[in-house]
Swiss-Prot record:
It is found in: Cell membrane. InterPro entries: GPCR_Rhodpsn, GPCR_Rhodpsn_7TM, Prostanoid_rcpt, Thbox_rcpt. It is a multi-pass membrane protein. The modification Phosphoserine is found at residue 328. Receptor for thromboxane A2 (TXA2), a potent stimulator of platelet aggregation. The activity of this receptor is mediated by a G-protein that activates a phosphatidylinositol-calcium second messenger system. In the kidney, the binding of TXA2 to glomerular TP receptors causes intense vasoconstriction. Activates phospholipase C and adenylyl cyclase. The chain crosses the membrane at residues 30-52, 66-86, 106-127, 148-170, 192-217, 245-268, 288-309. Residues 1-29, 87-105, 171-191, 269-287 are extracellular. One of its GO terms (biological process) is negative regulation of cell migration involved in sprouting angiogenesis. Belongs to the G-protein coupled receptor 1 family. Keywords: Cell membrane, Disulfide bond, G-protein coupled receptor, Glycoprotein, Membrane, Phosphoprotein, Receptor, Transducer, Transmembrane, Transmembrane helix. This is Thromboxane A2 receptor. One of its GO terms (cellular component) is acrosomal vesicle.
């Protein structure tokens, strides 16, 4: 345990920052501007989604999952951004604003929840498209209701994991420079176990998305380029895969550096945290940088949908419409071709 004043909660540990540094970087405007950019991007995507015609079948299911992803990103930026901006306004003095650590525990759980949800939803979307493209007749028809049930399951799963430190497995602590709370990169078994659970679950989600999307794209390409093919994928099939691949690339670039850093830090032989709870200065700064990179995932996700819609793709590539007409992959002749040698 860390040595703290008895009047303070258990989330406080020594942080490598002086009062002068704290005052120099304690500007709420950067945090507020960053949050406003993300909120505006997600609101724009939600408005575009609201005006989309989902129809029925795979597209309605995909749009429901995508709406769940954008809504999650919006709420994540709203909740965590408000806390970060308030702490910057308080000159990063978390002890003065939250001595009992209630806000810190709330933000730590929110960081885990809103961090894992996009990765899990990305994997769920990849699985939905994988089954829809490669095995369209092996499952019940995709519906938006089933998709929203999947979103609900992801929320419950991520929320349950985020509550574990409040139940005794792992700890949330104030992180450098004092504007946010996150899981503790300590050497205690609970900290290591919880950190590994978070990083491994996120990494597996990204890896699963990569695998399933690769197979789905390869299947679409095989159908499109097959010489004997008389039918082509509909443009909506290609549109959904382009958007899904874009979401996967954004999640990989934004989140994998942080997840790998957490794994390396927790598994290395020499602990990076002293018995008093102080992290190495380089470790604290690296964690902050990787966290900021990961936050861009919530800002870029909505732009993947906004920019990779059919209407935009047609303007960028006029042949997109003429090349990708015809019936869906879900017709029996196409399925026979997909299941062929």
């Amino acid at each position: 345990m860390w040595l703290n004043s008895t009047s303070l909660g258990a989330c406080f540990r020594p942080v490598n920052i002086t009062l002068q540094e704290r005052r120099a970087i304690a500007s709420p405007w950067f945090a507020a501007s960053f949050c406003a950019l993300g909120l505006g991007s997600n609101l724009l995507a939600l408005s575009v989604l609201a005006g989309a015609r989902p129809g029925a079948g795979p597209r309605s299911s995909f749009l429901a999952l995508l709406c769940g992803l954008v809504l999650t990103d919006f709420l994540g930026l709203l909740v965590t951004g408000a806390v970060v901006a308030s702490q910057h306004a308080a000159l990063l003095d978390w002890r003065a604003t939250d001595p009992g650590c209630r806000l810190c525990h709330f933000m730590g759980a929110a960081m885990v929840f809103f961090g894992l949800c996009p990765l899990l939803l990305g994997a769920a979307m990849a699985a939905e498209r994988f089954v829809g493209i490669t095995r369209p007749f092996s499952r019940p028809a995709a519906t938006s209701r089933r998709a929203w049930a999947t979103v609900g399951l992801v929320w419950v799963g991520a929320g349950t994991l985020g509550l574990l430190p409040l139940l005794g497995l792992g700890r949330y602590s104030v992180q450098y420079p004092g504007s946010w709370c996150f899981l503790t990169l300590g050497a205690e078994r609970g900290d290591v176990a919880f950190g590994l659970m978070f990083a491994l679950l996120g990494s597996v989600s990204v890896g699963l998305s990569l695998l399933l999307n690769t197979v789905s794209v390869a299947t679409l390409c095989r159908v499109y380029h097959a010489r004997e093919a008389t039918q082509r994928p509909r443009d909506c099939e290609v549109e959904m895969m382009v958007q899904l691949v874009g979401i996967m690339v954004v999640a990989t670039v934004c989140w994998m550096p942080l997840l790998v850093f957490i794994l390396q830090t927790l598994l290395q032989t020499l602990p990076v945290m002293s018995p008093s709870g102080q992290l190495l200065r380089t470790t604290e700064r690296q964690l902050l940088i990787y966290l900021r990179v990961a936050t861009w995932n919530q800002i870029l996700d909505p732009w993947v949908y906004i920019l990779f819609r059919r209407s935009v793709l047609r303007r960028l590539h006029p042949r997109f419409t003429s090349q990708l007409q015809a019936v869906s992959l879900h017709s029996p002749p196409t399925q026979a071709m997909l299941s062929g040698p």
